[in-house]
Swiss-Prot record:
Active site: D256
Cofactor(s) of this protein: Mg(2+); Mn(2+)
Protein name per Swiss-Prot or TrEMBL: Protein nucleotidyltransferase YdiU
Binding site for Mg(2+): N257, D266
Broadest EC class assigned to this enzyme: transferase
Organism domain of life: Bacteria
Gene source species: Dechloromonas aromatica (strain RCB)
EC number: 2.7.7.-, 2.7.7.108
Gene name, Swiss-Prot/TrEMBL: ydiU
Length: 499
């Protein structure tokens, strides 16, 4: 690996706050070089967030740097250890099996850690090759940035770097890696690891690190660790509410894939809801349907129970740890979900019966299965006060999503009756709804089409999707084709944990 002085431009100096923890928490090691790397896609928004110099972005060495082939100034690469529950079963020790934390950058926009996912074997690889493939790396890159555009808390992605190195999965694919960016990558499973080993000292060291680095306000609480658990519970509730509101399904909500910062983490077999089915399984490795759309709020709460159990040695009143989760998570999820759904439905002010109306709406969607994203986007354009032929003409695009149009008309009548209870200028309401209901989401078929071209070294669709998904609530008529229903060829697409 080349030394930092070989870099073409001055690079912001890294620090690695996680490396200040004892070495039991990680293994220091350098990324394994990726031969002859090349750039597949770059998020200039994330580059700006990091304050990367333009000369570096345009440099031929950029791919070498973010393939892990060049050491960055101040970088102390490491792979972290953690454990976790996978599909509801204790899996024991896991860890960064192919991710290398390069370090962090601090600027006026915050503290940002950069992690290379797919940078080679670590002591936690459990026999795997430590690589990621082009397919999964493009999916994670695009979805990270798409979720940011949607306003959902998420890790970010700076770039995808590819190589022609073959790797074996279900078939031979080519290696790639994604440079992930977040304030931190500590997981629920990071705490479970030490709790499962009765290592209270390390458990407290980790909690202190999280408080001091990310949540200093917790230090002023009567019990800082109880405050931290409640903070994580609240942020997780808000996160899951955002997922549900945009129709996002994570696909593999294991405790090692849950961020203590309330961020969407580890994009694998994810999906966005199309024809609405609350029982949809987006991960074909999820044979029991544990991670369906409807189950996500319950699974997140179960994961928080696992975290609360890990926190027990730190709490003054351990007997109420799960009660704290129930109260904090439950309230945060319910309040955030109601607020987001009221915005999607154009309800100016929440009324006591809105929870029932929202529930009835989801029952209606379940029965008739329109496309989730198109339903709410087209609803956003409807008037609350037209009559007769004018209303029928305005309603036609939404009604076209239904076989049973009489049922659609009946629901629309109920919706308009609810709108009348909190009057709002039609134009203002429509603008508000359009800002709450995206036109564009990263449908699996869109990602698949871009991946197929990328395998032929054509990355134009990766860039086109990235550009579009930065502003998913804007009309962007030049991207109308990306808002279409899935084509026939996409009906058999499946995604799994293989990456």
């Amino acid at each position: 690996m080349n030394a930092p002085e070989s870099l073409p431009v001055e690079f912001p100096v890294f620090d690695n706050s996680f490396a200040a923890l004892p070495e039991a928490f990680y293994t220091r090691l350098e990324p394994h070089p990726l031969p002859e790397p090349y750039v597949v896609g770059v998020s200039t928004e994330v580059a700006d967030l990091l304050g990367l110099p333009a000369e570096l972005m345009n440099s031929p060495q950029f791919a070498e740097i973010f393939a892990g082939n060049r050491l960055l100034p101040g970088s102390e690469p490491l792979a972290a250890v953690y454990s976790g529950h996978q599909f509801g079963v204790w899996a024991g020790q896991l860890g960064d099996g192919r991710a290398h934390l390069l370090g962090g950058l601090r600027n006026d926009q915050g503290h940002w850690e950069i992690q290379l996912k797919g940078a080679g074997r670590t002591p936690y690889s459990r026999g795997a090759d430590g690589r990621a493939v082009l397919r999964s790396s493009i999916r994670e890159f695009l979805c990270s940035e798409a979720m940011a555009g949607l306003g959902v808390p998420t890790t970010r992605a700076l770039c995808v770097i590819g190589a022609d190195q073959p790797v074996r999965r279900e078939e031979i694919e080519t290696a790639a890696l994604v440079a992930r960016v977040a304030p931190g990558f500590v997981r629920f499973g990071s705490f479970e690891h030490w709790a499962s080993r009765d290592r209270s000292r390390e458990l407290q060291q980790l909690a202190d690190y999280v408080i001091d680095t990310f949540r200093p306000a917790c230090r002023d609480a009567e019990n800082p660790y109880d405050a931290l658990l409640r903070d994580i519970s609240r942020r997780t509730g808000e996160l899951i509410a955002h997922w549900m509101a945009v129709g996002f399904m994570h696909g593999v909500m294991n405790t090692d894939n849950m961020s203590i910062l309330g961020l969407t983490l580890d994009y694998g077999p994810f999906g966005f809801m199309e024809a609405f089915d609350a029982g949809h399984i987006c991960n074909h490795s999820d044979h029991q349907g544990r991670y369906t759309y409807r189950n996500q709020p319950h699974v997140a709460q179960w994961n928080l129970y696992c975290l609360a159990d890990a926190f027990l040695p730190l709490l003054k009143h351990p007997d109420i740890s799960r009660v704290a989760v129930d109260e904090t998570y439950g309230d945060a999820f319910a309040q955030t979900f109601e607020r987001l759904m009221c915005a999607k439905l154009g309800l100016r002010h929440a009324l006591p019966d809105d929870e029932n109306f929202i529930g009835e709406t989801f029952g209606f969607l379940q029965q008739h299965r329109p496309d989730f994203t198109l339903f709410f986007r087209r609803l956003s354009r409807l008037s609350g006060g037209l009559d007769g032929e004018a209303m029928a003409k305005a309603d036609a695009p939404l009604r076209d999503l239904f076989v049973d149009r009489a049922a659609c008309d009946a629901w629309l009548a109920n919706w308009r009756a609810r709108l009348a209870q909190t009057p709002w200028d039609d134009g203002e309401r429509q603008a508000s709804m359009l800002a709450a209901n995206p036109k564009y989401v990263l449908r699996n078929w869109l990602a698949e089409a871009a991946i197929r071209k990328a395998k032929l070294k054509d990355y134009s669709d990766v860039q086109r999707l990235l550009t579009c998904l930065r502003r998913p609530y804007d009309e962007q008529p030049e991207f109308d084709d990306l808002a279409a229903l899935p084509p026939d060829w996409a009906s058999g697409l499946e995604v799994s944990c293989s990456s």
